Design a protein with these regions (language model features):
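Sec/Tat signal peptide C-region and signal peptidase I cleavage site
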Residues: 19-25
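An amphipathic alpha-helix signature
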Residues: 92-96, 100, 117, 121-124
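Short, cysteine/histidine-rich loop/knuckle motifs that typically chelate Zn2+
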Residues: 45
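Hydrophobic helical h-region of N-terminal Sec-dependent signal peptides
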Residues: 6-14
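A structural feature that tracks compact, well-ordered secondary-structure segments
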Residues: 84-88, 97-98, 109-111
């Protein structure tokens, strides 16, 4: 009885462990794969104005057109780029090189850089399939430079004091 239960538990764990990879790998068309990666990667959270406020129900026609709401921190003020305009001006190779490069906060560039070339190509093809639309995001503002757009202050508050040795 215990061996049967252990075997069933192991089989279930293996099936569940492979579930997300199977689901992701089952998307063979590069454009559909790119759509999937954009959605689960959270690209729209910042790069689509109003996406969070609509709980992800923004029309796909509006996806990845950037935002005029900035993120301000010690690095200055950055704005989510209009990826549809940006990628319309990049070759696939230029996109992959850019995706592997360090970017200003709060862009989680290290997550993008960890993606496979095939995933980055799929994202590129998806964004290009949407076509260029919208206007460029506002320009970067250096630390201390005044901005006249809305922005989030990205500085943690109420952090505990640093402990020696950590």
């Amino acid at each position: 009885m215990n061996q049967t239960l252990a075997a069933a538990t192991l089989a279930a764990a293996l099936a569940l462990g492979n579930g997300p990879a199977w689901a992701a790998d089952s998307v063979q068309d590069p454009i559909e794969r790119g759509r999937y990666l954009v959605r689960i990667g959270g690209c729209n959270d910042c790069h689509t104005a109003g996406y969070l406020e609509t709980a992800g129900r923004s029309p796909e026609a509006d996806w990845l057109t950037g935002s005029a709401v900035g993120f301000q921190g010690p690095w200055g003020t950055t704005y989510p780029a209009n990826l549809r305009i940006a990628l319309a001006n990049y070759s696939e190779a230029q996109w992959i090189a850019r995706a592997r490069s360090e970017m200003r906060p709060p862009m989680p560039w290290f997550n993008l850089a960890a993606m496979t070339d095939d995933d980055l190509k799929a994202m590129y093809r998806y964004v290009r399939s949407l076509g260029a639309r919208g206007t460029p995001a506002p320009d970067y503002a250096a630390p201390g430079q005044a901005v006249n757009t809305p922005y989030f202050v990205f500085v943690p508050q109420n952090l505990p004091p640093k402990t020696a040795g950590r």
